[in-house]
From Swiss-Prot:
Signal peptide: none annotated. Keywords: Meiosis, Nucleus. It comes from Schizosaccharomyces pombe (strain 972 / ATCC 24843) (Fission yeast). It is found in: Nucleus envelope. PANTHER family: NUCLEAR PORE COMPLEX PROTEIN NUP93 (PTHR11225:SF4), NUCLEAR PORE COMPLEX PROTEIN NUP93 NUCLEOPORIN NUP93 DEAD EYE PROTEIN (PTHR11225). One of its GO terms (biological process) is meiotic cell cycle. GO terms for molecular function: structural constituent of nuclear pore. Belongs to the nucleoporin interacting component (NIC) family. Has a role in meiosis. This is Meiotically up-regulated gene 87 protein. It comes from the Eukaryota. InterPro entries: Nucleoporin_int_Nup93/Nic96 (IPR007231).
Length: 851
């Protein structure tokens, strides 16, 4: 057997040659010189197709190529057929083939297949979630970037509404609301709410608009309270249990509307009598009041001021008897609400009326005695006949006589105005109200039917600009809407101008059950203060107010409100059953946005005792009967929301306040795990998180009752994560011995001194126990392994470069470091499915540097 001779020189085969080759091999392993890949397979394929399309076709086809191949002894046609017969699709080996050939390959194939399927599913889910996130973000951004002109006008209106005293006014209303809520929490139903708000409005009634707002509060108070300041709606606060706004078939409750009509009319009558007294006091010489200042003398004095000039009555059509315009006298008695005085006047002067209207005393007496102000049928027929024959068609008749007959007999309801004597807005509305009636009978003829709904339609037909001088005095139209019982429209109209009063009107109406409310909107506006309308039409055509949106918007726009005051404005939602869940949701959002946990949710002292908060003390007002229910509905829900939003520090505190201590520790572990993951990139650890974790664990450890509520595995995981933090901090400070000591206490890595015989067994045992670790610790194992390996490498390099690197102790240490490094590499490859490839590459490089 002959061997080929080697022509290389002899010295090349010596020790220097082998040393040079080994060094070169080590350098290539540590820093492999791989070529730089400029294009991936997809780009290469795309470029190949592009170049193929750019190659010009040969004029003679493939003739030259055929001749060239034939000259080399190749049959081009046969070769082309063989190429076409080849299958270029590589069929993956089937499970059956793998099972008969190689079990290890079979397992590896299935593992890779599962990993790829999982990754593909994860990528698809991530893409779907990202697309949804982009769509939601675009919707919110688009809405903000395209504000409508209505929103701009609405914002300008709100800006105009802040007159002097607006801040003090809103603060005073807020403190009054809080006081009423506290009294209700202690004593139950609060009947003084409307009177308390009315007093605040009186205190700030300094100009025309604020005075009219005060008048509106007095009007609402007259509807709600009786003469003894006791609410007429019982002690439930919900009108569906006392007066139904709408019955099940949608018909309007006549009893409720009649009360609104009567109260509004009486309010206007009392208001007019005050104006009358002021006019008399202002012009006493023209009034010529003589004798006792009785009601009749005051009415006569007002007639002198209004209808008498230089001793002559200005209207020649007035019927004057004994120097008294009797029809004007009776009309203004009715206008001031003195019906009994008018009846007494006609009875005392019956002989005078025999000359002008013989039967009128009977008419007005029957009108006063009728329960609903409707004359008996016989008298009504006589009055209609007299009205049609002597009053309605006569051009020179007394206008006050026309008005009085129209009021008492409800004549000619197709014309409900009397412009010659009711030229002022309040007089016009009063005239409409005194003509309106609410009937329960279905047999009422059409010409006799004129109700509060008809008055409402008349008012709405004019619109707001007609009564407010093109928007310069919006409170006037609000006042008229309140007079007609259109509370929902009134509040919606007032809110852009005077939000504080509008919100408190809404709270009061809802509290006493006067408000028709829409179903819960379930979506909170992203742009507070820019709500165009809060009215929703019901099936019966009546508007309903989105009460929840109103309160939420006010709490978001009013900057003067503290978190507790904001909660006071959300609590009234619970007066309406359908808003209870929205109230709880809004309170949770308030807690997270303000982060005023101590005042809103309370605190837990070091001894485990609770310090109650505002919401806990007022839990009965938000439909929560017990502390346990309160913690579940409010505190725990807020904690879950904070957890979902990634506010982990807030979630920890909220779970702690909700007395779900195990969940608090779970979030702590998650936060620690996330911080450890970021540590490898930033080498910075949040000190506040560490101090919070240690302080809370110290509280739990010192209180057996709290300690028992935390799961053992959670406590163990927290301790292991804190040890990991210590190891990472030690590594940052280049204290590698301490880093390895802390990691050794984890008992995750094979860092303990081992005999070579049991080394493999221990490593495999730790690798099997790996999957039982908590996920927050599990995800940090690659970082833990890398920190341990780098610490060993640094210690190895330090020991090797020391001046005592050749003694026996140093040699033993170096050998121990290499053994630990080898075990770590072995351990890492046993759990390689959880180890990134770059980590494995770094581990191999470290091991090579240590050998």
């Amino acid at each position: 057997m002959t061997v080929a001779s080697d022509d290389s020189p002899k010295e090349a085969r010596g020790i220097p040659f082998l040393d040079q080759k080994s060094r070169k091999l080590a350098n290539e392993l540590l820093e492999p010189c791989l070529p730089f890949i400029q294009f991936n397979l997809g780009e290469i394929e795309q470029r190949a197709k592009h170049y193929l399309n750019t190659v010009p076709t040969s004029k003679d086809g493939n003739t030259k190529a055929h001749y060239l191949l034939a000259g080399s002894g190749i049959n081009a046609e046969q070769t082309w057929k063989k190429i076409e017969s080849l299958s270029l699709q590589v069929r993956p080996p089937t499970t059956l083939e793998l099972s008969f050939t190689d079990v290890d390959m079979f397992l590896k194939y299935h593992r890779e297949k599962n990993v790829l399927n999982s990754l593909e599913a994860l990528v698809q889910n991530t893409q779907i979630a990202f697309d949804q996130y982009l769509e939601e973000e675009w919707r919110s951004k688009a809405a903000k970037s395209r504000p409508s002109f209505d929103n701009i006008l609405l914002e300008n209106k709100k800006r105009v509404s802040f007159y002097p005293f607006s801040v003090q006014r809103s603060q005073k209303f807020a403190s009054t609301l809080k006081m009423c809520l506290e009294e209700e929490a202690l004593h139950g139903f609060q009947s003084k709410l409307v009177s308390s708000f009315c007093e605040v409005a009186r205190e700030f009634a300094h100009d025309t608009k604020s005075l009219l707002l005060y008048e509106s509060w007095k009007l609402l108070s007259s509807v709600i309270l009786d003469k003894d300041s006791v609410t007429v709606f019982g002690n439930k606060g919900i009108i569906s249990k006392a007066f139904d706004i709408e019955t099940e078939d949608g018909s309007v409750n006549s009893r409720f509307y009649q009360r609104i009509s009567d109260c509004s009319r009486k309010f206007l009558e009392a208001q007019f009598f005050e104006v009358l007294n002021k006019e008399i006091a202002k012009t006493p010489q023209a009034a010529l009041v003589g004798g006792v200042p009785s009601i009749r003398n005051k009415i006569r004095a007002y007639l002198n001021i209004r209808l008498l000039r230089n001793g002559v009555w200005i209207n020649p059509d007035l019927e004057i008897i004994q120097d008294v315009p009797i029809w004007a006298f009776i009309f203004y008695l009715l206008r001031c609400g003195f019906l009994k005085e008018a009846v007494d006047f006609t009875e005392e002067n019956r002989d005078l009326f025999e000359k002008v209207a013989e039967k009128f005393p009977f008419y007005i007496n029957a009108y006063a005695k009728a329960p609903n102000g409707i004359l008996p049928r016989q008298l009504r027929s006589q009055l209609f006949s007299e009205f049609n024959q002597t009053i309605r068609l006569q051009e020179s008749s007394d206008p006050y006589k026309y008005a009085v007959y129209k009021i008492i007999g409800r004549c000619d309801l197709s014309k409900t105005s009397c412009p010659s004597i009711c030229s002022v807005t309040e007089d016009y509305i009063w005239f409409q109200l005194i003509l309106s009636r609410e009937f329960t009978e279905k047999s009422v003829s059409a010409h006799e039917f004129f109700s509060l709904e008809d008055v409402q339609h008349i008012l709405l037909s004019y619109g707001s600009d007609y009564f407010t001088n093109n928007g310069s005095n919006p409170v006037m139209y609000f006042f008229l809407l309140m007079l007609c019982g259109l509370y929902e429209r009134a509040i919606n109209f007032l809110y852009p101008y005077f939000p504080t009063d509008a919100v408190h009107f809404a709270i009061t109406c809802a509290y006493y059950g006067l408000l028709r409310t829409a179903p819960s909107s379930s979506v909170v506006s992203n742009e507070p203060g820019k709500i165009q309308s809060m009215l929703v039409e019901t099936k019966s055509g009546k508007p309903s107010l989105e009460f929840d949106r109103l309160l939420i918007d006010y709490t978001q726009t009013c900057q003067e409100l503290s978190p507790v005051m904001s909660a006071c404005y959300l609590i009234p939602m619970c007066k309406i059953d359908k808003y209870i869940s929205m109230c709880h949701k809004s309170l949770c959002s308030l807690v997270l946005s303000t982060r005023d946990y101590v005042n809103l949710l309370g605190d837990i002292r070091g001894d485990g005792e609770r310090t109650p908060s505002f919401l806990e003390n007022h839990r009965s007002l938000i439909g929560l009967s017990s502390v346990k229910e309160y913690l579940s509905k409010i505190t725990l829900t807020a904690a879950k929301q904070a957890d979902d939003q990634g506010l982990l520090s807030d979630a920890i505190l909220l779970y702690h306040l909700a007395e779900d201590y195990d969940a608090a520790v779970t979030v702590i572990n998650r936060r620690l795990g996330s911080a450890l993951l970021r540590f490898l990139d930033q080498f910075v650890f949040p000190d506040k998180l560490i101090s919070l974790t240690k302080s809370m664990m110290d509280v739990y450890n010192r209180n057996p009752s709290l300690y028992a509520k935390v799961d053992y595995k959670n406590r163990e995981t927290t301790n292991l994560l804190l040890l990991t933090v210590e190891a990472f901090n030690a590594y940052t400070n280049k204290d590698y011995e301490q880093a390895l000591s802390s990691l050794q206490q984890l008992e995750i890595l094979p860092l303990d001194p081992l005999d070579s015989d049991c080394e493999t067994f221990v490593v495999r045992k730790l690798a099997k126990e790996f999957r039982f670790l908590n996920e927050n610790l599990l995800q940090n194992v690659p970082g833990i392994v890398l920190i341990a390996m780098n610490s060993l490498k640094e210690l190895y390099a330090k020991q090797k470069s020391s001046s005592f690197g050749n003694d026996a102790i140093s040699v033993d240490k170096l050998r121990l470091y290499r053994q630990k490094a080898r075990r770590i590499v072995m351990y890492s490859f046993l759990i390689e499915y959880r180890m990134p490839s770059q980590i494995l590459e770094q581990l191999n490089r470290c091991e090579i540097e240590m050998t």
